[in-house]
């Protein structure tokens, strides 16, 4: 929100300079991003009138002018501007003036003709571009001799206020002024009288509000018989420009001016272009509308529109249609001033690639009781400038759907609890009265009702924030911390998340943080069987679904980096995923990662290879090795929609799936925007947050026996199944089983494979006997045969 300081000071005028005003606004939560002067420094430039213009005797492109600058005698100025004519009002830098760039005006002779000053264009004074090739033309009623800085209010400053979404009430000069008045405890004064414009004409335009939830209030009236040549006054154009908008024509400028002044967006239709009744309704699927920016839209059924008998004429609260726009030939106007519910506007502008000042305000919320005042103000300005006859008001109001402020209880002890300081009851009441709240004292504190424009007030904490803002956070005394200071401790069996993250960083991963909201279509493709939540008011359509997995965010990060020539990527993220079962929302902490590209960074040896499934499995096993379930988690082949059917596995713990990993399905590579073979994993954090308690154990001093066994098994049998079978052998001397070969080929049937294992056998307290070792080997062979039908090769 760009705020003209001089305009603001017409409403409220604290005894603060510009910098102090900006600082106080920032401390009160209206953060000031910057302060810009409306014009650079220059001196001795006045309003002048060109009396006569004659051609220069020795220069075809120069003119000799006589100029009235408000002195006793006119001055002669040689001028090269193409648009200089007798009778015009212009900006004149007198002798002694200093223009931007330290350009000093002196008496001079141009081609032998004396020149005592300089007639200036807008660019020479550092003023906004007026689109004129030549002199900056001033209004005919500009008083000759007046200092230009005073006449155009060029000592004004534009304060850029960055508002948070909940402070939509400050998207106007009046809104910011209300806060300044409360903060500074100074009077708030409206600089214009509340005038009710005479409405003696008959309104032939009927209005039918079909969707009363989306539009609980619609006001309008016709204006005709006005001066169609009337132009926007320079003071109004100036204020509109300083707010960051461009003047268009009188009608549009007045609606924009009222929006900037009071915060109520408005729209004006060419009444002669409207056919039949105005209807406020939802769009019919695939209806067309050409907007004012000449963009044809195909409307969706969830879009609120203003329509006539021929179809839509405006996107409600967003932008008007070209088919009903006001032009230089318009003789009858229909002014619309409505209240649109935020839920009916949120996201609709972005849905069509639009963002307007109107949608910006309606999305955040506008005072439901402001349209009456705003319409009267617009009609007052219009009739004062252009005259005309105003019809009676057309009003369609559904009181039940209007936001009604509710009383909120405020307790003194809660103020102390949240702000850390006790504020006198009288001061609390004074603060809320300055904020225009209705204050009622009761046994437990106060019942406070916010004014209609403060629809962000919902709970007690909101009220306490207001107390802190207006009292001044910088006025809160410093207090010592009251809580006992002690370092948090974890049981020895629990490990902190940062250790898990550090383990991945040590393996070459980079940590990322992605949004919890993802594209609905992509999520459905990746996890079609998992119920998910959708946001009612998403930031954008591609951030509508709450993630059920970390994979969409990880893949978007990979896509972003691959487009920037980063081909070797190893990333991980820890966070919540959201699912919905039996009408209940579940939030599960998980950790996930992704790898793609070469295994190692480029190095001088030139030896490298692409990552594969087993590289990722090694990363996952590193995390499992930190936990107490390292030996209990099993990797079992399975199929997920997101993974390649032959390159995926589930992590199974006690019969439950606690994680999954695999290669991204080739059919999803394009829609995910990535290239190459991407490998992903995700597991529940709870699985690895409990670790083994370290226990010292002496190393056996006695010889270790190693025996190699090769088993022939079914070719489809996972190796883990064979290892699990051997694990069922009850023995204290079997220390480890390691795979050293898997073979398929000559001597083995096509439907089988050979798995070669090394068994490490050792007793803790004595040397083993051959009989003990042989007995163990027999048990291993027997278990392998019983459980997986393995034959000793």
Curated annotation (Swiss-Prot):
Domain tRNA-binding, first and last residues per copy: 39-149
Disulphide connectivity of cysteines: none
Location in the cell: Cytoplasm
Enzymatic class: ligase
Catalyzed chemical reaction(s): tRNA(Phe) + L-phenylalanine + ATP = L-phenylalanyl-tRNA(Phe) + AMP + diphosphate + H(+)
EC numbers for this chain: 6.1.1.20
Keywords recorded for this protein, A-Z: Aminoacyl-tRNA synthetase, ATP-binding, Cytoplasm, Ligase, Magnesium, Metal-binding, Nucleotide-binding, Protein biosynthesis, RNA-binding, tRNA-binding
Residue numbers binding Mg(2+): 456, 462, 465-466
Keyword Plastid: no
Domain of life: Bacteria
CC annotations in GO: phenylalanine-tRNA ligase complex
Pfam families listed in its UniProt record: B3_4, B5, FDX-ACB, tRNA_bind, tRNA_synthFbeta
Gene3D superfamilies per record: 3.30.56.10, Bira Bifunctional Protein, Domain 2, Ferrodoxin-fold anticodon-binding domain, Nucleic acid-binding proteins, Phenylalanyl-trna Synthetase, Chain B, domain 3
NCBIfam families documented for this protein: pheT_bact, YtpR
Oligomeric form and interacting partners: Tetramer of two alpha and two beta subunits.
Protein name per its UniProtKB record: Phenylalanine--tRNA ligase beta subunit
Species of the source: Hydrogenovibrio crunogenus (strain DSM 25203 / XCL-2) (Thiomicrospira crunogena)
Gene field: pheT
């Amino acid at each position: 929100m760009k705020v003209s300081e001089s305009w603001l000071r017409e409403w409220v005028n604290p005894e603060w300079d510009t910098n102090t005003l900006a600082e106080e606004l920032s401390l009160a939560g209206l953060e000031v991003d910057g302060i810009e002067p409306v014009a650079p420094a220059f001196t001795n430039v006045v309003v002048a009138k060109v009396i006569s213009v004659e051609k220069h005797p020795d220069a075809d492109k120069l003119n000799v002018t006589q100029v009235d600058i408000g002195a006793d005698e006119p001055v002669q100025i040689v001028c090269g501007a193409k648009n200089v004519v007798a009778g015009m009002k212009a900006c004149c830098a007198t002798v002694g003036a200093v223009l931007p760039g330290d350009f000093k005006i002196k008496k001079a002779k141009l081609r032998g003709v004396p020149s005592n000053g300089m007639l200036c264009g807008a660019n020479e004074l550092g003023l906004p571009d007026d689109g004129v090739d030549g002199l900056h033309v001033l209004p005919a009623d500009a008083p000759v001799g007046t200092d230009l800085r005073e006449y155009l209010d060029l000592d004004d400053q534009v304060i850029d206020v960055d508002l948070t979404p909940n402070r939509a009430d400050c998207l106007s000069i009046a809104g910011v002024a209300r806060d300044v008045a409360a903060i500074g405890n100074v009077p708030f004064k409206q600089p214009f009288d509340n005038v009710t414009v005479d409405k003696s004409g008959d309104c032939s335009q009927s209005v039918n509000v079909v969707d009363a939830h989306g539009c609980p209030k619609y006001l309008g009236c016709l204006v005709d018989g006005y001066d169609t040549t009337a132009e926007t006054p320079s003071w109004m154009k100036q204020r509109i420009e300083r707010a960051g908008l461009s003047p268009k024509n009188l009608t549009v400028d007045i609606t924009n001016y009222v929006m900037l002044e009071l915060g109520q967006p408005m729209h004006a239709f060419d009444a002669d272009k409207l056919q039949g009744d105005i209807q406020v309704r939802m769009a019919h699927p695939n209806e067309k509308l050409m907007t004012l920016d000449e963009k044809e839209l195909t409307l969706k059924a969830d879009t609120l529109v203003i329509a006539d008998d021929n179809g839509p004429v405006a996107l409600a609260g967003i932008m008007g249609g070209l088919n009903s726009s006001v032009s230089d030939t318009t003789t009858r106007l229909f002014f619309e001033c409505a209240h649109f519910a935020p839920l009916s506007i949120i996201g609709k502008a972005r849905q069509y690639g639009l963002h307007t000042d109107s949608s910006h305000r309606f999305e955040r919320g506008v005072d439901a009781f402001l349209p009456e005042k705003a319409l009267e103000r617009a009609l007052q300005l219009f009739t004062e400038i252009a005259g005309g006859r105003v019809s009676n008001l057309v009003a369609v109001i559904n009181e039940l759907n209007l936001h009604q402020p509710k009383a909120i209880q405020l307790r003194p002890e809660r103020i102390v609890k949240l702000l850390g300081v006790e504020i006198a009851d009288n001061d609390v009441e004074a603060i809320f009265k300055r904020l225009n709240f209705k204050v009622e004292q009761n046994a437990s504190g106060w019942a406070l009702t916010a004014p209609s424009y403060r629809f962000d007030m919902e709970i007690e904490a909101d009220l306490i924030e207001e107390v802190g803002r207006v009292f001044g956070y910088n006025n809160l005394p410093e207090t010592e911390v009251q809580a006992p200071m002690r370092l948090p401790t974890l049981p020895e069996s629990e490990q902190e998340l940062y250790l898990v993250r550090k383990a991945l960083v040590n393996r070459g991963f980079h940590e990322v943080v992605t949004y919890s909201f993802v594209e609905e279509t992509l999520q459905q493709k990746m996890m079609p069987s998992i119920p998910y939540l959708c946001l009612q008011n998403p930031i954008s359509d591609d951030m509508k679904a709450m993630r059920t997995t970390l994979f969409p965010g990880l893949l978007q990060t990979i896509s972003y980096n691959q487009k920037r020539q980063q081909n070797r990527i190893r990333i991980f993220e820890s966070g919540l995923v959201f699912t919905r079962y039996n009408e209940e929302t579940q939030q599960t902490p998980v950790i996930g990662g992704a790898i793609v590209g070469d295994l190692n960074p480029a190095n001088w040896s030139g030896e490298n290879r692409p990552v594969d499934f087993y590289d990722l499995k090694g990363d996952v096993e590193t995390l499992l090795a930190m936990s107490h379930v390292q030996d209990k988690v099993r990797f079992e082949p399975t199929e997920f929609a997101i993974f390649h059917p032959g390159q995926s596995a589930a992590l199974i713990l006690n019969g439950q799936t606690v994680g999954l990993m695999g290669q991204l399905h080739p059919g999803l590579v394009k829609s995910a925007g990535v290239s190459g073979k991407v490998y992903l994993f995700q597991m529940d954090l709870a699985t690895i947050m409990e670790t083994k308690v370290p226990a010292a154990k002496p190393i056996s001093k006695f010889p270790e026996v190693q025996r190699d066994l090769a088993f022939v098994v079914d070719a489809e049998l996972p190796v883990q199944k064979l290892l699990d079978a051997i694990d069922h052998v009850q023995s204290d001397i079997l220390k480890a089983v390691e795979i050293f070969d898997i073979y398929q080929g000559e001597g083995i049937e096509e439907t089988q494979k050979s798995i070669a294992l090394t068994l490490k056998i050792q007793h803790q307290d004595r040397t083993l006997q051959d009989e003990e070792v042989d007995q163990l080997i027999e048990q291993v062979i027997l278990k392998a045969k019983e459980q997986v039908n393995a034959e000793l090769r």
